[in-house]
């Protein structure tokens, strides 16, 4: 299937600052391609430090009036954004598929609708938020106010470009902040098109979108003296740098980072549910998911029954043209990611691991121009293996046999990460006990990779700081002010 790219994507994009697309301070651009075909989609402006200065200055100016708008006004604008996203769902989903390589069935059903739902959700959250008043005694009163922080600086990863942007933008502007956000230089196009919705709905300067390299303009955003709050989704290595910038400037940071999550299949699991859940955990979005269930821990009693079913299921996955509605897995997002995946396959071949399914790049039937990889299942002898400890970020699943629930818990916790995990069991008490014992921010029971609004998402340990996607995330973008009132009109007698 082929579409006319220019029906969806402009040939060039400027920076979105103060409600307009503008030229950058430099004429440098970055080529943006379709990872499934190698086709050039567009050229984006390569922002420099001067552009970051401009965007932050505009955001600071806009904050003065935006922070004073009523909650109901902000809520209505967020709802309008969500409505317009849904009205343009098919177009924006196609842009996401063209730019990211993920299947159109996912962008149409998940990425764009869930982005829209986040704007609707945080409209309701801010509209129903209430402060508190505490009567300390008959003469004194404590009022607690939640106030916006100021200018938010955000950078989001390439795996869910529009959805992750919504996770940042919706709560930030709902709380009364303004934002300067930068998408990945490889997948910026959906957010740039959605800027046209912001242009229609929001006052100028509330949302500003820069494009460029993370090591250049992204770093400049995080180290800018005019930025009051940092928010980042990406690798743990870069997360350390963002945390250092936050510490240096003494500003708060929300970090959603890497993971090596364990998906635990107990001996009483419904195997039909488990097979589907395992695939949801590692094949959804080509495995390019921070919460991917990339370590499969299988009870020894059902190991020999489950593994052949997985081998068959993996071999039947349709990998191909992301624009085809029947495609279940599309292209990896770029050559660097494909090379990284291949490097771990090489490690498996040179070690005592056993490749049970997949393990190859796909190049037949017109796939040679893209970065397609087979669903891959690898048995490793224990959790100390390199493939069981490091985040691969692709459709590569390591499987480890466990003898009981406690061993599953111990192995699940034997990781520097703590983002997510899963448990499959028909005994809810047993599943809950494991869920409580595993040190991660999210545990799914009898499903995987469901991330709706209204349920907190974020990690323990090296997987990040803070939570997103639920009402408590609003506090990430607020400061608490206490107004303490003495109505006694009486001297205290100390001086």
From Swiss-Prot:
Matching Pfam families: Aldedh (PF00171)
Reaction it catalyzes = an aldehyde + NAD(+) + H2O = a carboxylate + NADH + 2 H(+)
Which EC number applies? Answer: 1.2.1.3
State where NAD(+) binds.
212-218
Q: Does the keyword NAD apply?
A: yes
- Which PANTHER family does the record match to this protein? ALDEHYDE DEHYDROGENASE B-RELATED (PTHR43111:SF1)
Q: Would you tell me the protein name for this molecule?
A: Putative aldehyde dehydrogenase AldA
State the organism of origin: Staphylococcus aureus (strain bovine RF122 / ET3-1)
Lineage of producing organism: Bacteria, Bacillati, Bacillota, Bacilli, Bacillales
Report the gene name.
Answer: aldA
């Amino acid at each position: 299937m082929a579409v006319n790219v220019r029906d969806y994507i402009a040939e060039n994009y400027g920076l979105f600052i103060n409600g307009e697309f503008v030229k950058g301070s430099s004429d440098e651009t970055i080529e943006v391609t379709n990872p499934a075909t190698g086709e050039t989609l567009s050229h984006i402006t390569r922002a420099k430090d001067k552009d970051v200065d401009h965007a932050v200055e505009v955001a600071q100016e806009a904050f003065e009036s935006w922070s004073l708008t009523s909650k109901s006004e902000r809520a209505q604008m967020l709802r309008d954004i969500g409505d317009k996203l849904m009205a343009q769902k098919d177009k924006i989903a196609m842009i996401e598929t063209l730019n990211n390589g993920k299947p159109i069935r996912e962008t149409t059903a998940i990425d764009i609708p869930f982005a829209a739902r986040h704007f609707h959700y945080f409209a309701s959250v801010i509209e129903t938020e209430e402060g508190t008043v505490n009567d300390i005694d008959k003469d004194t009163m404590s009022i607690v106010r939640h106030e916006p922080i100021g200018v938010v600086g955000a950078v989001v990863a390439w795996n869910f470009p529009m959805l992750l942007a919504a996770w940042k933008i919706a709560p930030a502007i709902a709380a009364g902040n303004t934002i300067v956000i930068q998408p990945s230089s490889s997948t910026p196009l959906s957010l740039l098109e959605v800027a046209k919705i912001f242009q229609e709905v929001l006052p100028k300067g509330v949302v500003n979108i820069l494009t460029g390299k993370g090591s250049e303009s992204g770093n400049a955003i995080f180290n800018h003296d005019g930025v009051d709050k940092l928010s980042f989704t990406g690798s743990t290595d870069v997360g350390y740098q963002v945390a250092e910038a936050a510490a240096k400037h003494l500003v708060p940071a929300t970090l959603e980072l890497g993971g090596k999550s364990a998906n635990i299949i107990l001996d009483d699991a419904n195997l039909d549910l488990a097979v589907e859940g395992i695939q949801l955990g590692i094949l959804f979005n080509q495995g390019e998911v921070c919460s991917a269930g990339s370590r499969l821990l299988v009870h020894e009693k059902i190991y020999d029954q489950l593994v052949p079913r997985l081998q068959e299921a993996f071999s039947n996955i349709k990998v191909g043209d992301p624009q085809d509605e029947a495609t279940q897995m599309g292209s990896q997002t770029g050559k660097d990611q494909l090379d990284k995946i291949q490097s771990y396959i090489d490690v498996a071949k040179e070690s005592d691991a056993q490749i049970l399914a997949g393990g190859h790049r796909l190049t037949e039937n017109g796939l040679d121009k893209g970065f397609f990889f087979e669903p891959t299942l690898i048995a490793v002898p224990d959790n100390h293996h390199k493939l069981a400890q490091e985040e691969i970020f692709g459709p590569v699943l390591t499987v480890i046999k466990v003898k009981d629930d406690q061993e599953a818990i111990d192995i699940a916790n034997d990781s520097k990460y703590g983002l997510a995990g899963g448990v499959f069991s028909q005994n809810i008490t047993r599943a809950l006990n494991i869920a409580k014992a595993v040190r991660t921010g999210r545990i799914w029971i009898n499903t995987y990779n469901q991330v709706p609004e209204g349920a907190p998402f974020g990690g323990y340990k090296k997987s990040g700081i803070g939570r997103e996607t639920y009402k408590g995330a609003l506090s990430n973008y607020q400061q608490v002010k206490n107004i303490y009132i003495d109505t006694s009109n009486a001297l205290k007698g100390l001086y």
